[in-house]
A protein has these predicted regions:
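Post-signal peptide N-terminal regions of Sec-secreted extracellular proteins
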Residues: 34-169
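N-terminal prepro-regions of secreted/extracellular proteins
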Residues: 1-53
Length: 169
């Protein structure tokens, strides 16, 4: 017979493996280099604003089921002939739910004012749901095939404030 302590340890390990297999990270990572919506709105750092009801291609590179039918996705699409990525929260959202997109681009992040390199990444957001059922997107940015140029989507619900992030894409 397995004792309760080893069983709990086994279940915790299995839960962690399942979360990793699903491509989901639950909190506990290093913080971003910067965390202000103004770092990626209004054309800052090459990000572009677009409507909150925007959707990308049918294939979503990353998807997190937040619970209660609320979904956070990393969307991709095409804008003026270039592939782009952005984050989105949708479903029966509530005021205070949040979405943001992290961008890391080692070697691509130079050229700004001194001291503004993006290390370890730039957090684009958070953007906060204002009304029940509101879909909300982050600004978009062009993508690259360079493995040093990556995105992930993160979010939290007002009901529990647990931050969840997808794997990098």
């Amino acid at each position: 017979m397995i004792g309760m302590r080893p069983l709990r340890s086994l279940l915790a390990s299995l839960t962690a493996v399942c979360a990793l297999a699903a491509g989901v990270t639950v909190a506990g990572t290093a913080g971003p280099a910067q965390a202000a919506a103004s770092d990626c709105t209004g054309g800052a750092r090459g990000f572009r604003d677009h409507p909150d009801d925007a959707s990308g291609d049918t294939h979503k590179p990353r998807r997190i089921e937040m619970g209660g039918g609320i979904v956070i996705t990393l969307e991709k699409g095409v804008y003026v002939g270039q592939q782009i990525a952005f984050g989105k929260i949708s479903g029966p959202t509530f005021p205070g739910d949040k979405v943001w997109m992290d961008w890391k681009a080692d070697g691509w992040d130079q050229g700004g004012p001194p001291g503004t390199a993006i290390r370890p990444w730039l957090q684009c957001g958070p953007f906060t749901v204002q009304r029940i059922g509101q879909s909300l997107t982050t600004p978009f940015k062009r993508t690259s095939t360079d493995p040093a140029y990556q995105f992930r989507v993160c979010g939290s619900l007002n009901s529990n404030h647990v931050v969840r992030c997808s794997e990098w894409w």
